[in-house]
Amino acid sequence: MQQNELKTPYFSINEDKLIENLEKAKQLKDISGVKLVLALKCFSTWGVFDIIKPYLDGTTSSGPFEVKLGYETFGGETHAYSVGYSEDDVRDVADICDKMIFNSQSQLAAYRHIVEGKASIGLRLNPGVSYAGQDLANPARQFSRLGVQADHIKPEIFDGIDGVMFHMNCENKDVDAFIGLLDAISAQFGEYLDKLDWVSMGGGVFFTWPGYDIEKLGLALKAFAEKHGVQMYLEPGERIITKTTDLVVTVVDIVENVKKTAIVDSATEAHRLDTLIYNEPASILEASENGEHEYVIGSCSCLAGDQFCVANFEQPLEIGQRLHILDSAGYTMVKLNWFNGLRMPSVYCERSNGDIQKLNEFDYSDFKRSLSQWSVI
């Protein structure tokens, strides 16, 4: 099977690029002693977990089905966290998770009796500081519901928990900024951390970014762990799968209204939602910054503003031409939806030996079932 034989749209995960990121993760672990758990909210394509497992320590989840998926398909440590648990959620996962992290002191009080003796118990804290490029993704934004604020903490709570989680970064490429956050947490919560077994610093630390000083990060994490006598965790998601995956699409039409728009057989609304939510234009492999031919890369959905990007090309685009939308693994496959009844992208993995293996495909029956399974009588 060759790439040009695959029917678009589809995601193509490259094993070599994935391993390149994982080797950086291993380097960080070796320097720091930190444990890394994959954030399934970002990437849950379990068909490639056998590639990832040797490098990471387990998974972390944001909902009960992610907990079950991590337990069944990844193994290692299974961390369960939710912004808001129901009692059924807690009971469903208490027997299969290694750590259960509550978002509030009230949820901790309500459900800890279900978890005690089964899993290590943690609490999410909100230090009121963060590193996030957009307010939508900022855990320390005004009126944040994420974690317990410092001035709301009941000190006695730390006598009955094993660890805490801070998640305050989003695409933080600045190691010094992260170390500054570590120092702020140590100063603000140090007396509490000294009583605990583990601390998770969450995700969003972009240690796989080109040129990132992994050694400096690792030594800072190691120093923090030694100072407070805790096992440190990070929860990478996009850091593991960044630049590993293309969304491959085909130009199905070209229209002109002042600008030329190449319409492709995919949509941000359905297949690459964060492009739309965060207004972050996609990048196209075939584009050229100095190309003379400019096109809007538009989707085939009915949403007027649904477009991937504006890009320049050396040669005019043609109907039937394929384009590779780069870096399309994070928060894409986990957010796929059936808007407009569009064809759902298949998922493939390009192995190191050149083989292409199918991981998932969808058809009309999947679309129909997602809408109803039974009719009114």
From Swiss-Prot:
Optimum temperature is 37 degrees Celsius. 75% and 51% of the maximum activity remains at 30 and 45 degrees Celsius, respectively, but the activity decreases rapidly at temperatures above 55 or below 20 degrees Celsius. The keyword Lyase applies. Keywords: Cytoplasm, Decarboxylase, Lyase, Polyamine biosynthesis, Pyridoxal phosphate, Spermidine biosynthesis. Dithiothreitol greatly stimulates activity, maximum stimulation being at 5-20 mM dithiothreitol concentration. Fe(3+), Fe(2+) and Mn(2+) severely inhibit activity (88%, 82% and 50%, respectively), whereas Zn(2+) has a slightly inhibitory effect (23%) and Mg(2+), Ca(2+), Cu(2+) and Cu(+) have no effect. The keyword Metal-binding does not apply. Its cofactor is pyridoxal 5'-phosphate. Homodimer. NCBIfam families: nspC. PANTHER family: CARBOXYNORSPERMIDINE_CARBOXYSPERMIDINE DECARBOXYLASE (PTHR43727:SF1), DIAMINOPIMELATE DECARBOXYLASE (PTHR43727). This is Carboxynorspermidine/carboxyspermidine decarboxylase. It comes from Vibrio alginolyticus.
